[in-house]
Amino acid sequence: MAKQIEADARTAPVDISFLMAAHNAAPWIETAIRSALDQAGVAVEVLVVDDGSTDGTASVLARLAAADPRIRPIPLDAAGTHAPRGPSAARNAALAAARGRWVAILDADDLIVPDRSHTLLDLAAATDADLIADNPIPFTGAFDPGGAGMLDRCREPYLFTVELAQYLTCNRMLTPGVKLGYLKPMLRADFVRRHGLRYVDTVRVGEDFLFCVAALAEGARFVVSSYAGYGYRRGPASLSHRLRLADIEHLDAAFAAYAEGGALAGHRARSAGIRQASRAYRDSLATAQVIARVVEAAQGGRWLRGAALALARPRAWRFLTGSLMAAAGKRAGRRLRPAMPDALPAGPR
């Protein structure tokens, strides 16, 4: 009987395939998986890729999968002994195995509320969206579904569409405002397959942003709602909590490849607005790389080298001096000493 139930679950139609990359997520992954399984009014599967975890994540996943056939552990060839390959490779493995009409991103340390999937599917049907996203609610301790979202909440719900130039502009590094790259969209699986969309394996931070750029460049209709149903956990466990130089370099190389070839290159050739937005985004990455090099130099005691790097790029200098002044203000009343940030603020997740 148990085998028949499992076989039925493997062949039954699926509305949404949740793609979950997990690395050392043992404290949170059960909450994340159960939140996906508890979606109301939709048939789901949860495809979980354990990416070289060493903290018991695999044991938690095995226990949950044994109890519910909708949970599908997806193998991933390791880069080495317990060496994680990164979220992009893990997402690609899950994406290749997905059976749902839609695919949805759910990080292993996040969660979603029970009516999220049904609500977003209804909105997608009403707006003919290929990508649909809601308003993430950041949290650090206990999740409050009524908490403040990243986007403004109004008395009346609202929707807006996201164009390619707008998406590039709002996701520039080191600029104020909401980064739409933090959104965790659901995507029509047939659109993804039709255009051969995949994650860039080398990118560990900003992978969802790049995936959405590729989708928009292929003509996807991207709709965002003020409805808030995704709980986004902030904290050191999040890959996007900090950006290191290597992260930015990989993101820059991947974006450059997009900009110089494929669908995005065609948009840049035809649209001055997209050319400008693309250049501005890459310029922000260049500034972020300089800042990361300054931080590395300062951490190694090479202060003069760091100062020279910053002075050579005025935007980097302004950002760093502003950060130091803000840090000094927080230490008012105490002895001040120079302090460098140990990493950059997070960019698109």
Where do the model's predicted regions map?
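C-terminal subregions of glycosyltransferases and related glycan-biosynthesis enzymes
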Residues: 2-3, 210, 217, 222-349
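Nucleotide-sugar donor-binding/catalytic module of glycosyltransferases
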Residues: 2-246, 335-336
